[in-house]
Amino acid sequence: MCVRLRRRDFLFLAAAAAVLRGEDRPKRDMLSRSVRPEDLEMPLSGFSDYLTPAEHFFVRAHVYVPTVNLSEWRLNVGGSVASPLALTLDDLKRLPAAELVSVLECAGNGRAFFEPPVPGLQWGHGAVGNARWRGVRLADVLKRAGLKASAREILLDGADVPLGSMPDFQRSLPLEKALDPNTLLAYDMNGEALPVKHGFPLRVVAPGWAGDSWTKWLTSIRVLDQEHDGFWMKSAYRHPGRPVAPGVAVPLDRMRPVTNLRVKSVIASPLDGAQLDPGSPTMIRGMAWGADPVAAVDVSIDGGRVWKPASLIASQRTRFGWRQWEFAWTPQQASYFTILARARDAAGNTQPLDQEWNQSGYLWNAVQRVHVNVGSAVPKPAIPEQAYASQRPPAAFNNCLLCHNDDVIRQQRLTRAQWTAEINKMTGWGARIDDAGRDALLDYFDRLRP
């Protein structure tokens, strides 16, 4: 029997099939931080949604998005276990399901604000999102495999393939975090199959921890009886854990892995440089989050001299999700104002006015400052744009631009010594740059500095 479908029915079925396959909706109005691999930041307008839609959710990828054939995909569980497993997605969905709302934030969110500047993607405020995650508890999968008494860490690996001789992106979780009932292996995001760019078909959800522990495209769980010493644990995603003088590098062996997020808030409205009218009611709005639940947000409109409590949206009270806050203000006189928002969590941690510096640019949580102009015809002075050199040496075309787009390079504000360290890292991963090419690159990077 032949059934004729109307066009709208066909489009509906095609869209439904795409959801089941975890296909991505187009990312709109996002800020590009890298084209190859693709890294996208959510603009401040995205902080108006309690649950961040997938099409507005930030994207962080160290390598290119892998192609996953679901019929062949398996989650392999091995190492220090009694019964190694090879689970299909259907196998996982037959286990008891768990669901929670949690913020996912890149460890480097806010890196662009560090002074002195530090290398890496120059994220502003938007390498973060809040979603409803559904899947199975990692603890249930480990229980099914049978942990041996020697188990110490859980090594996580995905289907993504390293570029050149770059080390495979593997992260480990301590046993305590892995067995936490809130740590999930998620297959759904906001009620739909995980989009490909967000880890389809399976990703780790480690609530309260930075995104480097939220492994995407998960294919392997290996139970270790000793601490994992791979590059992405011992050399990357580490920070001092204590105050250091700005510009002072700390040896890797004196740093520790990034784990818990820090309490912070973002002012989404009004925007920096906004023009307001005297006597016009203005609602100051934003989001606040951290590893612990947000307890309060205070707002100042005079640069931090006087603070007043903002209102938290009561319906958004969850253990790991962010909280929207708002503060009503009616400016009475023409002037420039500096608006600040400061969050406090249930553990008593308060957002600092000034940021502790670290060489990797991780865990930025200093109070944001938004400058608005009330009633004056004179606009707030614009920050001059950097003047970029137009001539790139061959070494840039043959090495840097094979993986990174030009904007990523232009966003950096590094010293010659910092660029030298970055080139050394790339040559260690297989980039071929002779001495003349190295000097040409360093001279070019010097010209990029404002």
Residue ranges and their predicted role:
Residues V118-P119, Q412-A417:
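Short cysteine/histidine-rich zinc-coordinating motifs and their immediately flanking basic loops
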Residues V299, A431-P450:
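C-terminal capping alpha-helices of c-type cytochrome domains
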Residues C2-R6, L11-L75, V81-A82, A97, ...:
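Extended, aromatic/histidine-rich regions of cofactor-dependent oxidoreductases associated
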Residues A127-R137:
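Mid-length scaffold segments of soluble, non-membrane domains
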Residues A377-A396, G428-W429, D435-A436:
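Electrostatic cytochrome c docking/interface patches
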Residues A396-D407, L441:
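The canonical Cys-X-X-Cys-His
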Residues E99-A127:
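Short, conserved helix/loop micro-motifs enriched in His/Cys and acidic residues
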